[in-house]
Amino acid sequence: MSKKVLVVGVFDLFHRGHVEFLKKAATFGDELIILINGDEMTEKYKRRPIYSEQDRAAILSALSCVTVVEITNSFDVKPYIEKYNIDVIVHGNDWEHDSYLEQIRCTEEYLRQQNVTMAYTDYHSSVSTSALLKQIKEL
């Protein structure tokens, strides 16, 4: 039985930091499932994305390490954990564990019940969408 990995993110202005993160996330299992935060959701909590949710999904779907891409406008990942029988959720270590669980609407107890573990990868702030946007504004 294959091990399924879930990552969640906006993935706007796709860059090398995203590539490195997804390559690392893929090493935690056999199938990589990506939930893209939809346009509506992203605009409410962050900013309006530069690329549409469909464009971001197309870019991610083209990567060989990616098995499934879905767009969501909900922070709650429980339906996707159950739909895909997720084994591991991977995120950058720029988030504190409890804050991230709150963001994705999960509890430690729920994850234990579902046999889901959390894994965190190094976050490289030198390569980020925010940094790219800042550079573009300075042109």
Residue ranges and their predicted role:
Residues 1-139:
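Nucleotidyltransferase catalytic core that binds NTPs
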